[in-house]
């Protein structure tokens, strides 16, 4: 038994160290190298097999001492590993290149050999979808025709199906999944990745489902070790607690406005302009909504250098030469910064053009998509999107403000300068549509605010006459503008996060009953304030959108924060930990929502990233990180208590860390596998050994060790505290280190 346990520990440690080394090697040797020589190599699979078999035998030998919930947890991981083994043994992958009208029944595998598909597939059409109003590519769509010939004996007819594949839409036929990978320079050919895994995905999903059920059972079962740890963590009464001071400082360094003349657009005129309605994202909305999204998209927040989003947006319309030189476009990726030739992360629109008036990222992006270089695509996509957002504004796609109702009662919206065709309009209306924005620009530049206000009023009146059936009421417009202003304020969320984190730390470490009572009272007040704030936001969003706010990742996160607060306030009297951590969980959900809204989807770009699964995945992972952070802080306090020979306090804090460890590990496990499901639905594979997901797995394995009570070294409180403190380095590496030092498809920097 002892030797078997040592084998498990040695193999688990070896796996963790190998995974760490692999991510470092990948940054220098490339993904293909580590995938071939480490991740999918036979020796690494054997190592995982030894670990799984040894763990299974050890559990069976100790099954009388292991609860049903713990058995289910371990069984689920074994099933997940079995699914991975099945995929490794039976799954097929390869590439398929087709020209227009060409038919094939084979694919090329990783070794370059041709393998039969069992059906015929032909390229019906390949199409590049551009950003609206521009010639810049937004998506790549392949339309295939797949056909399986019927059996001559059974006289079955042929089974023919049309399949559409795009960047974020996987095509499927007879168990084979098609993923868009590249295209030919003449637009007459396409390259597709093919993946066929008839058994592995199903087995793995079964393991995921069993894991979720077993983790929930473990958390709420009365017979598991977590209950004992909970009682032990709260057993010490009357001990003197020392104050913990946490200083959180946030510094934002923004580039200063360039020292040149510019048109100072009056804030009042900009606000009036912001209430004009436009057709935006298939919805009639005030320009203020477009302005808020536009400015937030470019610089990460809804204002710039003290100017409101309305003023900045109006500036991009009425004072183009100046704003094209302002370095307000945030470029996060180093590769994009290098290609644009900028120092730091701030660029102007002028930085996107070379001396010959060529778009600097055009050639690298086309080559990346042609070659299927997903890493380079990812590095340049965000900068390219921001560039094209500005071009869309110039093309009038964000300023469709003139409605026209035809004889069929269908309402069309036109932008200033857009060809009107043969519309039944009198000469006065035609002149108004064509010239009103020119007159408004002239008034704004000349500082004639009275005339500008009058023109805005006329545009607004025209909208209500020509688009009466669809133009929102004045109350709805003012409500949406008010919602945008409230929602753009990020400081309340940072305040909630700071206060809830401080209160959680105080509630978990402070042992003085009177101070605990005060902390719990403040937690309740904070929960009520957060609930009122979140309810107002959700209600306003519900009203202005006309539907329940649960349609995208941002709304899902806000709703989850609201639901968490409801549960907290309903159950806080009976379950103290819910009172302690409910506001913190809610604050993290609001933080994820804020991060999501910090990169708003002005156009339908990368719709897969709007998946609620992705938002839940990020939220769950982040909350596990928060708990790991708390355990690191508790570890510091525990080591201080050990140094001062406060044995009782040291033991209690160790029990508290172990108590928090259960939900933390459960959350990171659930988060990882929700992410795997999302990846499978979106990209065709549930696990790709990306550096970020590999380090998340490393973190989960590291934090899983203290859950096993038979590891003698961790039974000492001092060792537990030291382990928790050092283990947090893996969290820092996962969240920050991977983004800045390693390669990969994830980036949260």
Where do the PLM segments sit?
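Solvent-exposed, non-transmembrane regions of integral membrane proteins
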Residues: 1-749
């Amino acid at each position: 038994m002892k030797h078997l346990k040592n084998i498990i520990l040695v193999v688990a440690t070896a796996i963790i160290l190998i995974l760490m080394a692999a991510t470092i090697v990948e940054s220098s040797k490339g993904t293909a190298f580590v995938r071939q020589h480490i991740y999918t190599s036979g020796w690494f699979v054997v190592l995982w097999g030894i670990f799984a078999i040894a763990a299974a035998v050890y559990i069976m030998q100790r099954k009388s001492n292991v609860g049903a919930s713990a058995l289910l947890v371990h069984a689920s991981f074994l099933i997940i590993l079995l699914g991975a083994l099945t995929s490794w043994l039976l799954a097929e992958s390869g590439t398929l290149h087709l020209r227009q009208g060409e038919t094939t029944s084979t694919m090329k595998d990783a070794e370059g050999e041709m393998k039969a598909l069992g059906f015929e597939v032909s390229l019906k059409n390949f199409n590049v979808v551009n950003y609206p109003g521009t010639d810049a590519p937004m998506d790549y769509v392949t339309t295939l025709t797949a056909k399986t010939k019927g059996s001559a004996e059974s006289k079955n007819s042929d089974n023919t199906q049309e399949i559409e594949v795009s960047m974020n839409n996987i095509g499927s036929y007879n168990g084979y999944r098609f993923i868009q990978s590249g295209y030919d320079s003449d637009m007459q050919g396409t390259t597709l990745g093919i993946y066929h895994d008839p058994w592995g995905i199903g087995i793995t999903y079964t393991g995921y489902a069993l894991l979720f059920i077993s983790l929930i059972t473990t958390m709420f079962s009365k017979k598991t070790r977590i209950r004992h740890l909970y009682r032990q963590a709260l057993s010490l009464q009357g001990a003197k607690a020392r104050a913990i001071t946490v200083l959180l400082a946030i510094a934002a360094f923004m580039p200063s406005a360039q020292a040149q003349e510019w048109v100072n657009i009056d804030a009042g005129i900009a606000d009036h302009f912001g209430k004009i309605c436009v057709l935006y994202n298939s919805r009639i909305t005030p320009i203020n909504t477009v302005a808020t999204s536009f400015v937030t998209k470019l610089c990460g927040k809804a204002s710039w250098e003290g100017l409101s989003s309305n003023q900045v947006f109006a500036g991009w319309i009425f004072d183009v030469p100046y704003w094209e030189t302002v370095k307000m476009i945030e470029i996060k990726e180093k590769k994009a910064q290098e290609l644009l030739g900028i120092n730091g992360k701030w660029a102007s629109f002028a930085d996107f053009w070379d001396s010959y008036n060529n778009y600097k990222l055009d050639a690298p992006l086309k080559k990346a998509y042609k070659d299927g270089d997903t890493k380079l695509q990812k590095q340049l996509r965000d900068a390219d999107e921001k560039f094209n957002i500005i071009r869309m504004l110039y093309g009038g796609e964000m300023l469709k403000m003139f409605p026209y109702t035809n004889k069929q009662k269908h309402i069309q919206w036109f932008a200033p300068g857009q060809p009107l065709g043969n519309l039944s309009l009198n000469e006065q209306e035609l002149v108004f549509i064509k010239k009103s924005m020119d007159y408004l620009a002239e008034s704004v530049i000349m500082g004639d605010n009275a005339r500008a206000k009058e023109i805005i009023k006329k545009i607004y009146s025209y909208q209500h006459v020509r688009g009466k059936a669809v133009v929102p009421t004045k109350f709805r417009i003012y409500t949406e503008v008010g919602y945008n202003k409230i929602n753009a304020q990020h400081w309340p969320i940072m305040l909630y996060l700071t206060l809830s984190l401080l209160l959680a730390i105080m509630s978990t470490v402070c042992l003085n009953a009177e101070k605990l009572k005060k902390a719990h009272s403040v937690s309740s007040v904070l929960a009520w304030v957060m609930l009122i704030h979140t309810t107002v936001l959700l209600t306003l969003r519900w009203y202005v959108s006309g539907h329940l706010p649960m349609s995208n990742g941002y709304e899902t996160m806000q709703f989850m924060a609201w639901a968490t607060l409801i549960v907290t306030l309903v159950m806080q009297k009976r379950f103290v930990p819910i009172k302690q951590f409910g506001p913190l969980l809610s604050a993290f959900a609001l933080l994820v929502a804020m991060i999501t809204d910090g990169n708003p989807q002005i156009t339908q770009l990368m719709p897969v990233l709007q998946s609620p699964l992705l938002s839940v995945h990020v939220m769950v992972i982040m909350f596990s990180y928060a708990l790991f952070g708390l355990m690191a802080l508790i570890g510091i306090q525990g080591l201080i208590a050990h140094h001062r020979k406060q044995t009782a306090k040291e033991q209690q804090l160790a029990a508290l860390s172990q108590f928090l460890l259960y939900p933390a590990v459960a959350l990171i496990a659930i988060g990882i596998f929700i992410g795997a499901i999302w990846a499978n639905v979106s990209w065709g594979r549930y696990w790709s050994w990306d550096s970020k997901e590999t380090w998340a797995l490393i973190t989960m394995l590291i934090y899983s060790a203290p859950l096993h009570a038979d590891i003698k070294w961790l039974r000492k409180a001092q060792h537990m505290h030291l382990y928790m403190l050092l283990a947090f380095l893996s969290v820092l590496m996962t969240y920050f280190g991977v983004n800045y030092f390693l390669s990969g498809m994830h980036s949260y920097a």
